[in-house]
Amino acid sequence: MELTTSHIQFIKEHATDDLTRLLLSAAKYPGMDIPFLVDQIAVRRQIREKLPSWFENGQLVFPAKIAAEQCSSEQTAAYKQELIGESWTICDLTGGLGIDSYFLSRKAKQLTYIERFPVYCEAAKHNFSVLEANNITIINADAAQVVDTLPAVSYTHLT
């Protein structure tokens, strides 16, 4: 799951458009996945205040509107980051959009992101790469089924 240059441009050009009309006019944009792009625009509208730095980064992709609704705000994630140690290894059992994982990884030594939905993992892989969060391992699994197989960590995050 990635945004191409044409996707990014489309999102910028149509950021304030009526999304229902945009969906209904999908035939005007051959080769563009209009439902996907409309979802990206809708999520960006949702996160403008909640995740300002992610809103500003046009290369980030969002797997689902509900992920944006359920995620921590940047302010909350930054607070959580203050509570951990620099040498810590962390496991985020409910990866979701990856906001907490990203902020915690900026201070932690290593972070494991676990998420059961493949599309969330694809988006997280892309976003963490864009954000240069290179100390995150992504596992696509139900946390309850893999938690006993994971190595010991300093902190297990579950929200």
Where are the regions that the model predicts?
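S-adenosyl-L-methionine
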Residues: 1-86, 123-150
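Conserved Rossmann-like nucleotide-cofactor binding loop
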Residues: 119
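Conserved SAM-binding loop of SAM-dependent methyltransferases across substrates and taxa
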Residues: 97-108
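Conserved SAM-binding motif I beta-strand of class I
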Residues: 110-115
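Conserved class I S-adenosyl-L-methionine
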Residues: 88-94
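Conserved small/polar residues in nucleotide/adenosyl-binding loops
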Residues: 156-159
